[in-house]
């Protein structure tokens, strides 16, 4: 069996590990944001997906980026959730930007960023000053330098 990387189609469809990961996001994120946002300044919470991919699978099913956007939409009336999505692959970033724009039109604060997540951590932490922050750095992010996470 040969390892399958992102360029070989790993992100083309939801695999069992992704299905499990997305189930956790579906059940945990709305609760996290609603519970922590209830007591936060302006009822505000910041969510980051550091390896968002294109946000949605080609078959239309939500990937991790869209899972965050769906969580924000679910609690939109009571909590202001700011969603930041980072993707380094340009082609996937373009699709991710379109997905984020869809939710922005629905009143969700959503922004897609192109590049390495390490380049955006300072900005994310700055935006989340004084409010709850959920950093999602999934297994694809195994190469994130520990120092980049701990310095912020």
Language-model features and meaning:
Residues 110-152:
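Active-site segment flanking the S-adenosylmethionine/decSAM binding pocket
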Residues 11, 23-125:
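SAM cofactor-binding core of SAM-dependent methyltransferases
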Residues 1-3, 43-44:
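Active-site-adjacent bridging/hinge elements
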Residues 6-14:
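Glycine- and acidic
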């Amino acid at each position: 069996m040969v390892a399958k990387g992102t360029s070989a189609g790993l992100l083309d469809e939801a695999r069992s590990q992704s299905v499990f990961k997305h189930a956790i996001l579906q059940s945990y994120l709305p609760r996290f944001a609603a519970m922590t946002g209830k007591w936060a300044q302006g009822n505000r919470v910041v969510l980051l997906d550091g390896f968002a991919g294109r946000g949605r699978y080609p078959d239309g099913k939500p990937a991790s980026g869209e899972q965050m956007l769906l969580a924000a939409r679910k609690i939109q009336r009571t909590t202001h959730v700011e969603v930041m999505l980072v993707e380094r692959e340009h082609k996937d970033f373009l699709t991710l930007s379109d997905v984020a724009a869809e939710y922005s039109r629905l009143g969700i604060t959503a922004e897609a960023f192109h590049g390495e997540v390490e380049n955006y951590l300072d900005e994310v932490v700055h935006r989340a000053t004084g409010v709850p922050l959920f950093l999602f750095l999934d297994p694809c992010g195994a190469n994130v330098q520990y120092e980049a996470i701990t310095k912020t």
